[in-house]
Amino acid sequence: MIDLETIGRRAKTAARTLAKVSTEQKNAALHAIADGLLARQDEILSANAADVADAERAGTPPAIVDRMLLTEARLATIANDCRKVAELPDPVGEIFDRRELPSGLRLYKRRVPIGVIGAIYEARPNVTVDIAALCLKAGNAVILRGGSDIARSVAATTTVIAEALEQAGLPIFAVQSITDPDRELVRQLLRLDRYVDMIIPRGGASLHRFCVENATVPVIVGGMGVSHIYVEPSADFARAVPVVVNAKVQRPGACNALDTLLVHRAAAPVFLPMVAAALAEYNVELRCDLETLAILADAPGHENWQLRPAEPADFGREFLALIVAIKVVGDIDEALDHIAQYGGHSEAILTGDPASAARFTREVDATAVFVNASTRFNDGGQFGLGAEVAISTNRLHARGPMGLQELTTYTWIGEGDYLVRA
């Protein structure tokens, strides 16, 4: 049985050291990780292939298998993201909010690491490196607990990370992995508040619920939610169709993939057949409300489209597959009401009307809102953050893609000339 107390104590000690090391030393470790991933590519991909084969034999859904899969291209992207994190400005030590008080006290905030991060994740071997890289750059130690379904992949990548830390002269316990599949260890990690400062779960709704219900450590909830695109009559339909297709098919298992398409009634007769034909090329199943179904059922080429009547539950569902729900709405008010009821993750409007765009961005409550752009942009790499540890749907501490700055907090610093309080 793994001793989590020891792991936590080692992480806390490592975090104190990381908070003091130079940016150059942290960057050296990140480049060493990237180099190691490429040098050990065959070993990592072989381990991942074994994980994927087990998952396929067990009947794991294709969307989950896709999340598990590492390829040469994906591994190269992970390594490149690591280098991008090294190139980003180091937030630790930043001075901001300077002021001088009437008492003569000179006050400012200094950005500091959070401390020890616990990461619990399923079916996402890339998370091992993404979280480790960002935590290291932000001066945090991290305790990783990957799912048993990716155990070989996690072991292969954490070996690379450990070697890189040693090569860069950083504490080897700055990144630790819990390899025992016993779920009780997850519960213990969630309650290790003596050492762990924040928990970041990356997985399905059941994992997030388990973390929230069992944690005494603050939990960042995110990565789940229904994403919408609303299409107005003023949109350029020819250019809007590729945006919808990109949002749905580029990576359907991603949390920022399109789930529900809302189309203004005045746009529906022309736009719906256009987008249905484009989505059909990728075998996307269309779950349509009655008005959408009536328009598409008689459209040219409909016999090649996967049309299904939508169930009420489809409009609150994160599909994570080549399925999209489609609904015709009467106006922007109805679209906003629908998104308020079901959305909150990644929301977009396709429009040529600046007033509608401004209203949409002002009234939609979500982690990210886009005008004439795909929901797939809600991503740390796309935002220039290098990578992200999560896309938080929390309102407190961080919201949206969590990059370096979101992995820090601050300390108030007060300086005086032997000041006493009056």
Curated annotation (Swiss-Prot):
Pathway: Amino-acid biosynthesis; L-proline biosynthesis; L-glutamate 5-semialdehyde from L-glutamate: step 2/2
Keywords of the record: Amino-acid biosynthesis, Cytoplasm, NADP, Oxidoreductase, Proline biosynthesis
InterPro entries: Ald_DH/histidinol_DH, Ald_DH_C, Ald_DH_N, Aldehyde_DH_dom, G-glutamylP_reductase_CS, Glu-5-SA_DH, GPR_dom
MF term (GO), any: glutamate-5-semialdehyde dehydrogenase activity
Coiled coil residues, start to end: none
EC code(s) of this entry: 1.2.1.41
Keyword Cytoplasm: yes
Record's catalysed reaction(s): L-glutamate 5-semialdehyde + phosphate + NADP(+) = L-glutamyl 5-phosphate + NADPH + H(+)
UniProt similarity note: Belongs to the gamma-glutamyl phosphate reductase family.
Job of this protein: Catalyzes the NADPH-dependent reduction of L-glutamate 5-phosphate into L-glutamate 5-semialdehyde and phosphate. The product spontaneously undergoes cyclization to form 1-pyrroline-5-carboxylate.
Name assigned to this protein: Gamma-glutamyl phosphate reductase
Organism: Chloroflexus aggregans (strain MD-66 / DSM 9485)
